[in-house]
Amino acid sequence: MKTSLSLFGIEDEIKQWLKEDIGSGDITTLATVPAGSTTRAIIHAKKPGILAGVDLAREVFHALDPSLKFTAILEDGAEMDATSVIATVEGDAQAILTGERLSLNLLQHLSGVATRTHQLAELIKPYRAKLVDTRKTTPGMRRLEKYAVRVGGGANHRLGLYDAMLIKDNHIKVAGGITAALDRARAYAGHMTKIEIEVENMDGVKEALAAGADVIMLDNMSADRMAECVKVIDHKAVVEASGGITEETIVAAAKSGVDVISVGALTHSVKALDISMDIGEIKTA
């Protein structure tokens, strides 16, 4: 899926990641690779999947050596097979080897997110439900992981605690109930702020609907119970299914008629896609 990633501020993040990895110096590369030598490396997939993170890989190599020639063969969103060539990097051999791990870490992780998202999004494609992520992201990586979700064909839930309200069970307990929580949220929020509330049963649905929730999250309900709730809500609020959604249950959830299906596993426990880098002949100065 075609989407865009803002690289604003990414240079600082990449420098921090490189500092974490390199420390005072890449002692293995410094010891084994002659200074001034050059090479050409090929980055390629070893498993089928959806590509994400090419621009980040380029930024990693350019942070180490701006003169490196990074040529992207594929763009983010490309469907890869087990032999797809993603990019080539030419130039200083020490810089290429030093940047290998970080660039691959980013490509593997983000492509893993995009691939898993694509797999689930394809399952519910015949239905109206939209697949979205959650805030269950890796600290410091949220905007990148949420970008990868978009690349894979999903959409983003709220970006953080600041752009939408989601009243969960603990908020409801502290506030004194569903109606009280929604009343307080509505009094606090601006007119542009959407308010979502989590409910666990039909009584909660009816109370949330009467109290004016914009979005009602059906938490850990069976598909049959979700379908009953959808009928009661009757388009008066957006309906989200959440909690325990898996590859085995997502189609049933979509068939229930919900508008949105949120899956934390898109980001919190995704398997990295196998991507590798092969070094060509080393040419000494």
Residue ranges and their predicted role:
Residues K2-A211, V215, D224-V232, V238-S242, ...:
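Acidic/glycine-rich phosphate/pyrophosphate-binding loops and surrounding catalytic core
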Residues H235-V238, E281-A285:
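Short acidic, glycine/proline-enriched helix-loop-strand junctions
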